[in-house]
């Protein structure tokens, strides 16, 4: 059985995390040549490339498996050794989360964990349709995803759903929808998407108004909080989680443009198995809080 030296695995991990050999060398306090040598040792051991040497570098499929192994070992070492290993540096937990969860329920859910445990969070924001891929690649140890099926050697639990409403300011509605929300009016109403792969707005309009994808003008803004600001100032109409705009809806600052119509996205918590003690506490915190504030019934659509 091929057993990698974990020092060489840490070099591979540093190159991926730091997005290059030079910064990885600085992080590890060794020379860039030493980083290259350690990775070459790994590649010789396994007889195949572990890095695609692009800018930034990315792991091959075998590299992804080794990174996942490293992260599991680090968590299990923490469980067995605890604070007896003489290292005062808080444990780094890399998690892949969607922007809307981060803007609404995730941080309150993690509050007791952050208060009780010596950990450092590395929250990597990604669309909920793609967070599981970061777990597959070994970039993170846990992911909030819409995928219900676990990856091999992983665990999954249902967290609950976010309900998305199609909202805008009253002034925006009066300007663009004076006769109600119609297909022709929607074609002229500015909207917003998180990135070019975010299809929630388009999917909602296609499902409920038979509008083809790409037919509605969309701003691209990589911020969940900015969606709320854009809607409040009357710039766009957009899909926003109900949980994020309860006060604005109650005050009338924002209005639901299509009462009775919504998008429900069920979220699931994925992580490696077996769980370390720390990850078990993270899981318990996320499941407990998520089940308090997220919808638990079956989702309506994606």
Swiss-Prot record:
Q: Which gene encodes it?
A: argP
- One GO BP annotation of this record: regulation of DNA-templated transcription
What the protein does comes down to: Controls the transcription of genes involved in arginine and lysine metabolism.
Protein name in UniProt = HTH-type transcriptional regulator ArgP
Q: Which organism is it from?
A: Yersinia pestis
> Which Pfam family, giving just one, matches this sequence?
LysR_substrate
Q: What are the record keywords, sorted?
A: DNA-binding, Transcription, Transcription regulation
The cysteines covalently paired via disulfide bonds are none
Cite the InterPro entries for this sequence. ArgP, ArgP_gammaproteobact, LTTR, LysR_subst-bd, Tscrpt_reg_HTH_LysR, WH-like_DNA-bd_sf, WH_DNA-bd_sf
């Amino acid at each position: 059985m091929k057993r990698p030296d974990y020092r060489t695995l840490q070099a591979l991990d540093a190159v991926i995390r730091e997005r290059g050999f030079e910064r990885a060398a600085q992080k590890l306090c060794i020379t860039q040549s030493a980083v290259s040598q350690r990775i070459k040792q790994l590649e010789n051991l396994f007889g195949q490339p572990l890095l695609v040497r692009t800018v930034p570098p990315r792991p091959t499929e075998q590299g992804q498996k080794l990174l996942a192994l490293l992260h599991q070992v680090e968590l299990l070492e923490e469980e067995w050794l605890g604070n007896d290993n003489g290292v005062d540096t808080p444990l780094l937990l890399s998690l892949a989360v969607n922007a809307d969860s981060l803007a609404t329920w995730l941080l309150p859910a993690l509050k007791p964990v952050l208060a009780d445990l010596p950990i450092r969070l590395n929250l990597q924001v990604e669309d909920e349709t793609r967070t599981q891929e970061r777990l597959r690649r070994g970039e993170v140890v846990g992911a909030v995803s819409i995928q219900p099926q676990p990856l091999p050697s992983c665990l999954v639990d249902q967290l609950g759903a976010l309900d998305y409403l199609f909202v805008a300011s009253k002034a925006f509605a009066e300007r663009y929808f004076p006769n109600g929300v119609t297909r022709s009016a929607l074609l002229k109403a500015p909207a917003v998407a998180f990135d070019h792969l975010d299809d929630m707005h388009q999917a909602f309009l296609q499902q409920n108004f038979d509008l083809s994808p790409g037919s509605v003008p969309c701003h691209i803004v990589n911020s969940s909080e900015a969606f709320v600001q854009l809607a409040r100032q009357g710039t766009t109409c957009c899909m926003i989680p109900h949980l994020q705009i309860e006060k604005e809806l109650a005050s009338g600052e924002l209005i639901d443009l299509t009462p009775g119509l919504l998008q429900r996205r069920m979220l699931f918590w994925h992580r490696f198995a077996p769980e370390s003690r720390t990850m078990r506490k993270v899981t318990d915190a996320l499941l407990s809080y998520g089940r308090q504030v997220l919808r638990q019934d079956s989702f309506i659509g994606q």
